[in-house]
């Protein structure tokens, strides 16, 4: 199957199957060792995804299978952008294996397009690099028990903190009342902040 056929099938399928991480309850994300694409694994046939899921479980990677119906696909594909995923690995380890870059399948609203309407260019509150690094970190951390955290996970943790500081934050403010605080019975006060 060529790439165009796979794209058409992804757009028109009644359902697709996705490998989900039990560690994050989100799509299982893999970094390709050659292209460095951050990929999710998608299959058209239930028996194929079950075979791949079984292989991953045998490798001690806790995963489950999720079915995405046609009416959920656009939402699913769009959410991959906010997760930092840039590629779909379709039917991995099969004759029909195909790598699809996410923008080839769905485009984002005009955030980065110069000719986009002004209402689409507004600031978006999202931090895909934080989300992606956190997914990799949790997938690896919860996969096995460590007596001490490996150096690779410590580096990911540092990257998460660096990405967190680059985030955009929104605080509520009421004219005349100032910044709202959530006061607890024990005297603690918290300021609500919304972030990516």
PLM features: residue spans?
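An interfacial alpha-helical scaffold signature
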Residues: 1-195
């Amino acid at each position: 199957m060529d790439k165009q056929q796979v794209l058409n099938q992804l757009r028109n399928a009644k359902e697709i199957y996705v490998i989900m991480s039990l560690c994050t309850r989100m799509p299982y994300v893999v970094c390709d060792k050659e292209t460095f694409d951050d990929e999710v694994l998608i299959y058209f046939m239930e028996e194929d995804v079950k075979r791949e899921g079984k292989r991953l479980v045998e490798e001690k990677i806790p995963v489950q299978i999720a079915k995405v119906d046609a009416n959920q696909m656009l939402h699913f594909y769009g959410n991959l952008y906010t997760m930092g995923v840039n590629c779909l690995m379709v039917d991995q380890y099969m004759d029909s294996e195909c790598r699809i870059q996410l923008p080839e399948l769905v485009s984002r609203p005009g955030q980065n397009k110069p000719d986009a309407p002004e209402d689409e260019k507004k600031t978006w509150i999202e931090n895909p690099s934080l989300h992606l690094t956190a997914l990799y970190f949790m997938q690896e951390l919860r996969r096995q028990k460590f007596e001490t955290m490996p150096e690779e996970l410590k580096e990911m943790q540092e990257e998460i903190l660096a990405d967190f500081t680059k985030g955009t934050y929104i605080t509520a403010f009421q004219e005349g009342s100032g910044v709202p605080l959530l006061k607890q019975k024990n005297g603690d006060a918290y300021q609500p902040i919304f972030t990516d």
